């Protein structure tokens, strides 16, 4: 049985919204965006594929409209469930997903 890293409680991720979670690594770590749509949690690197900028406009604050996460830097839009780019300068290149699972009411890295 493998041990997975707990990111947060499922209840911490608002329906139709997003939060950040930090992952420590030997290179200093990185931030994830955790989203929730219809109860399903998705996780992505907090980095726009267009220019490598963070997606949040302030730490942990995201612009989301009609199920689309909007990059604060250049306005690219991404589906909050799939990470697919719906419009903007990165059309056709989606967010890098990170596999997660729900364990005892917590979101964990898979």
Predicted regions and their residues:
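N-terminal pre-ligand scaffold of iron-sulfur
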Residues: 1-65, 79-80, 94-110
């Amino acid at each position: 049985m493998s041990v997975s890293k707990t990111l947060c409680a499922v209840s911490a991720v608002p329906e139709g919204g997003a939060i950040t979670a930090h992952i420590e690594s030997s290179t200093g770590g990185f931030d994830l965006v955790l989203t929730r749509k219809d109860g399903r949690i998705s996780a992505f690197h907090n980095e726009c594929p267009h220019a490598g900028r963070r997606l949040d406009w302030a730490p942990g604050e995201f612009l989301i409209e009609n199920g689309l996460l909007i990059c604060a830097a250049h306005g690219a839009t991404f589906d909050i469930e799939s990470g697919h780019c719906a419009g903007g300068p990165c059309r056709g290149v989606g967010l890098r997903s990170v596999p997660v699972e729900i364990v005892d009411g917590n979101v964990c890295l898979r």
